[in-house]
Amino acid sequence: DLVARKMMDGGEAAYRLIDEVEAAAEAARSSQPALATAVWNASEALREATEALVGQDLNDRFAGSVAYLRAFARVLGAHYHLQAGLADPARLPLAAFYITRLLPEYAPLLAQTREGAAGLYALTPEALLA
């Protein structure tokens, strides 16, 4: 659903959310530069992956859909943890943990979204048994 119906608008809904994440990260740079930069970089990578995904055919989108959803979740989680930490300094340690330990998982997930479906369709039951 995320990479099919929700991308029918050329990814506009995703871009609006990414814009929100980037604006918040930019605003947080003055008080939490390292955390904010990590969130901004991840959201920019998500933007680039979204652009690539929108340009793929539907089979290729579906092949990368789970990885894309997981990467999007990592970026949004980092965004919301950073916002919570800015609102309540007692939550900054959890935000830092999430951003430094869990957010980096977005990169290999986004790499998977670019692979398309060819490798999936090339797998045969026999190859899985080898």
Language-model regions, residue ranges each:
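Extended, well-ordered alpha-helical scaffold/bundle regions in very large, multi-domain proteins
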Residues: 13-14
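Catalytic or ion-translocation cores adjacent to nucleophile or general acid/base/metal-coordination motifs
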Residues: 1-2
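C-terminal amphipathic alpha-helical interaction region
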Residues: 6-9, 18-130
